[in-house]
């Protein structure tokens, strides 16, 4: 009897343990183990803005719960807040993800710096918090030379590169004297020296507008690109998320065009014949590896007659190893039909040929080979590099160059590559005029909320032919033109207009740090990704990640999409600024314009730091 009585007492305990186990398993499956690690549930948010007390606390809980149902999904009243250590999260360039997923990558090929996006179950569906004490960024043009230290609390480069004048910490700010590894005395003097080497008029590197788009590989904090802006040269400053700690984040905080990327195994997200000049100042790249594949990738993106400016010990040092590298590089570029345009002191500038004549005149079996005729040089998203030379089109060969007008006429001149899409000059001109009118409308709606210097970094999430960016020419802004990878690859038209951008899939996160853009333009992009079966909610969270606090989003989409976005405003801490129906004369007259502003909010930990 005694044993049976004790067994009877144990049964309820066992049942309770089983029920508790089931509940825990359900919670684990619902929230996802990887997401839970990144989130502190129930944290408080402090909301603030330019007109608010930044230390005012809000009672909004960051724990997730459902307000109502939209279609087959849920609309949250609030999103959880990511842990503070994720304040600089770049989902597709997250080394913690690489470790957790045990990806087998070849470090010697820089694969660990390439894009590796999380599967849906590993996404951090939470709001990225700003760092403690975050301030609205300093406005352009002052931002070129100084940023708030609290916004990017990384001073490693200031100490490591102290002898090269990259950056200097001064009180609450980080200053940028304009130095670099091979231009300690200033990027402006270095740029003028390069122009002088090429005998360009007045030592101006744009050569009367003939040179407009540059690529700076291993750009550091992008002072080279920042100082080129004064010469009306647009530079895509490129560097990986590596041990140099946040160099691209500094560049974007300064208001300088920049992109996180690496010369590894995949093609750069730019079409062929995009840049007039590529630049490498001691970028520590082994150009001879894998049959010169990295140099051939630069060759692919350079225009006919384009330049490669190379400042490195190999160009001038006399020790045995540097001399060996110089001999082998010289032989390689010679077989690629490059010639030396100028060489002085520490810098050599090579030039590509203007036509296919040299390529076709090489001896049979010469390496590197010409690319196969069926190889598309403009296919770039997730495409492996090829160790071959891309020939010019018949048009470029016959015209002995790209046939582009000098800047600024280039912006509104029909690009020669329009014919690749079957677009006429009339279509191009109508598109340019349509977006001029639309941008005028946008600025009329925004003007009560912004000053002339409020906006600097802009992203057009579906850029088409780049006419949105073209309409902003007279404003002191720059535009990252994004062309979705599943549509017409019109990015080459954008580069031919003297603008810049990248190919991307909005089903994935963009290669940039959080809080790097002042304004996002979302034309039909939410509708498009829903058609692809991707998550509109994920896209909205990604837009929030890359938008600066107090920044704006211009949404131009169908009424149903605008209604959906409005349901997320509170959860995302966005505020609707203006709503307007498109003009009846507009070709997208069924579109609705919604302008939202991201509020500045701080976590409770940040607020305590301010007290």
Curated annotation (Swiss-Prot):
What subcellular locations does the record give? Golgi apparatus membrane
Q: What is its EC number?
A: 2.1.1.-
Q: Name one Pfam family in it.
A: Methyltransf_29
GO BP field: methylation
Concerning Gene3D superfamilies, the annotation shows:
Vaccinia Virus protein VP39
> What is a single molecular function from GO for this protein?
methyltransferase activity
User: Which chain regions cross the lipid bilayer?
Assistant: 12-32
Keyword Transmembrane helix included in the entry's annotation:
yes
Q: Topology in the membrane?
A: Single-pass type II membrane protein
Q: Which family does it belong to?
A: Belongs to the methyltransferase superfamily.
Other comments on record? Co-expressed with the galacturonosyltransferases GAUT8/QUASIMODO1 and GAUT9.
| Name of the featured protein | Probable methyltransferase PMT1
Say which species the protein is native to: Arabidopsis thaliana (Mouse-ear cress)
Provide the organism lineage as a comma list: Eukaryota, Viridiplantae, Streptophyta, Embryophyta, Tracheophyta
């Amino acid at each position: 009897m005694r044993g049976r009585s004790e067994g009877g007492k144990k049964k309820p305990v066992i049942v309770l343990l089983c029920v508790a186990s089931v509940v825990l398993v359900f919670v684990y499956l619902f929230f996802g183990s990887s997401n839970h690690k990144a989130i502190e549930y129930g944290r408080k948010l402090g909301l603030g803005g330019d007109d608010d007390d930044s230390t005012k606390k809000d009672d909004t809980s960051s724990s997730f719960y459902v307000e109502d149902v939209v279609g087959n999904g849920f609309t949250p009243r609030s999103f959880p807040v990511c842990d503070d250590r994720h304040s600089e999260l770049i989902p597709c360039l997250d080394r913690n993800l690489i470790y957790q997923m045990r990806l087998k990558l070849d470090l010697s090929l820089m694969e660990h710096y390439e894009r590796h996006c999380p599967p849906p179950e590993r996404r951090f569906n939470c709001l990225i918090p700003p760092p403690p004490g975050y301030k609205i960024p300093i406005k352009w043009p002052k931002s070129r030379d100084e940023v708030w230290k609290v916004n990017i609390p990384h001073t490693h480069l200031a100490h490591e590169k102290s002898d090269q004048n990259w950056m200097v910490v001064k009180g609450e700010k980080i200053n940028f004297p304009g130095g670099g590894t091979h231009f300690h005395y200033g990027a402006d003097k270095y740029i003028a020296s390069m122009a002088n080497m090429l005998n360009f008029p007045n030592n101006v590197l744009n050569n009367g507008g003939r040179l407009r788009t540059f690529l700076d590989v291993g750009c550091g904090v992008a002072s080279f690109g920042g100082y080129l802006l004064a010469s009306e040269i647009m530079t895509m400053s490129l560097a990986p998320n590596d041990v140099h700690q946040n160099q691209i984040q500094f560049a974007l905080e300064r208001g300088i065009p920049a992109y996180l990327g690496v010369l590894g195994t995949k093609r750069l997200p730019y079409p062929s014949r995009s840049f007039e000049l590529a630049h490498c100042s001691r970028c520590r790249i082994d150009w001879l590896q894998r049959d010169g594949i990295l140099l051939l990738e630069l060759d692919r993106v350079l225009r006919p007659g384009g330049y490669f400016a190379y400042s490195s010990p190999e160009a001038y040092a006399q020790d045995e190893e540097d001399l060996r590298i110089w001999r082998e590089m010289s032989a390689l570029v010679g077989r690629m039909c490059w010639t030396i345009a100028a060489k002085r002191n520490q810098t050599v500038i090579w030039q590509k040929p203007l036509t296919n004549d040299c390529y076709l005149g090489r001896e049979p079996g010469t390496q590197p080979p010409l690319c196969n005729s069926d190889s598309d040089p403009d296919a770039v998203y997730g495409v492996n590099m090829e160790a071959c030379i891309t020939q010019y089109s018949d048009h470029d060969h016959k015209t002995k160059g790209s046939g582009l007008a000098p800047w600024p006429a280039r912006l509104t001149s029909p690009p020669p590559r329009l014919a690749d899409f079957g677009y006429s000059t009339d279509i191009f001109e109508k598109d340019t005029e349509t977006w001029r009118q639309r941008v005028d409308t946008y600025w009329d709606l925004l003007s009560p909320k912004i000053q002339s210097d409020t906006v600097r970094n802009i992203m057009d999430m579906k850029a088409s032919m780049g006419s949105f960016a073209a309409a902003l020419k007279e404003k002191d802004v720059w535009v990252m033109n994004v062309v979705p990878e599943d549509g017409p690859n019109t990015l080459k038209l954008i580069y031919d207009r003297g603008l810049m951008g990248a190919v991307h899939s909005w089903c994935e996160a963009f290669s940039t740090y959080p809080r790097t853009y002042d304004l996002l333009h979302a034309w039909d992009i939410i509708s498009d990704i829903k058609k692809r079966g991707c998550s509109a909610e994920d896209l909205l969270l990604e837009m929030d990640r890359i938008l600066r606090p107090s920044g704006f989003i211009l949404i131009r989409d169908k009424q149903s999409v605008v209604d959906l976005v409005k349901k997320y405003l509170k959860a995302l801490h966005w505020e609707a600024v203006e709503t307007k129906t498109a003009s009846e004369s507009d070709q997208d007259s069924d579109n609705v314009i919604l302008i939202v502003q991201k509020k500045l909010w701080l976590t409770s930990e940040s607020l305590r730091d301010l007290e």
